[in-house]
């Protein structure tokens, strides 16, 4: 798979929607994740990320302008022991609760589908990072409608064992702007991951469309043994 520039991917797409990046730094010592949200409506744009425990949740920037909280207020990031869960919806809780009961990432998501926001039927994208005794692996998932048909749910899981230093994967909800919004297609995109968190954060934030970007979260976890 050809490695893509995350900067170019974002600059050339005015509305990828919500996106998850997971990977490993070039020096092989840190696990990396990033999550961003975008919005076109006032309700979607009226959000910020706030810390909650070891993770984050979305919160209305102006509570007076909050219209429908059902699909926009949730915890995108939660930590369960040596696992970090990152998603674009309340399936974060579904995965957390399932894995806490010894279910797998994939099994935990069996009870969920795409979001009920027809005609877009926004995909649910999710990721989990597992770090233990200096080893690291991660998985990503997308649950989406079958070409806009809400009667059929397509489920895809991508697992990455012993990921390569300096590489990561990027998945987002929409291929591009549109009406209805077209769901993401294909495998998560292979991208480069730098060593410096501030550099990566700046690259992501400044590459996102100025009119549509809302919030960005980036985390580097220093717990990998580089051999």
Locate predicted features:
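Intrinsically disordered, low-complexity terminal regulatory regions
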Residues: 2-33
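Alpha/propeptide regions of enzymes that mature by internal proteolysis
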Residues: 3-10, 57-68, 77-117, 186-199, ...
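Short hydrophobic alpha-helical segments used for membrane anchoring or interfacial signaling
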Residues: 20-27, 126-132, 218-221
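Glycine/small-residue-rich interface belts in oligomeric ring/scaffold proteins
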Residues: 29-79
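Short hydrophobic-aromatic micro-motifs
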Residues: 31-34, 84-93, 128, 137-143, ...
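C-terminal, well-structured catalytic/ligand-binding subdomain of enzymes
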Residues: 80, 144-203
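Short histidine
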Residues: 91-151
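Conserved small/polar residues in nucleotide/adenosyl-binding loops
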Residues: 225-227
């Amino acid at each position: 798979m050809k490695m893509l520039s995350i900067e170019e991917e974002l600059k050339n797409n005015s509305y990828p929607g919500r996106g998850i990046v997971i990977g490993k730094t070039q020096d092989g010592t840190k696990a990396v994740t990033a999550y961003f949200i975008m919005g076109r409506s006032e309700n979607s744009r009226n959000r910020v990320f706030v810390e909650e425990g070891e993770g984050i949740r979305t919160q209305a920037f102006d509570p007076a302008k909050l219209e429908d909280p059902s699909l926009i207020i949730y915890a995108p990031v939660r930590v369960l022991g040596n696992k970090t869960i990152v998603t674009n919806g309340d399936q974060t809780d579904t995965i957390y609760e399932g894995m806490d009961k010894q279910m797998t990432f994939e099994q935990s998501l069996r009870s969920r589908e795409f979001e009920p926001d027809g005609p877009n039927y926004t995909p649910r994208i999710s990721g989990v990072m597992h770090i233990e005794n200096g080893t690291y692996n991660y998985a990503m998932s997308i649950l989406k409608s079958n070409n806009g048909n809400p009667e059929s749910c397509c489920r895809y899981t991508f697992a990455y064992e012993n990921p390569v230093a300096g590489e990561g994967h990027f998945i987002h909800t929409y291929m591009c702007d549109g009406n209805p919004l077209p769901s993401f297609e294909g495998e998560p995109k292979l991208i480069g991951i730098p060593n410096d968190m501030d550099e990566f954060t700046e690259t992501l934030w400044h590459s996102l469309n100025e009119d549509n970007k809302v919030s960005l979260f980036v985390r580097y976890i220093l717990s990998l043994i580089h051999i």
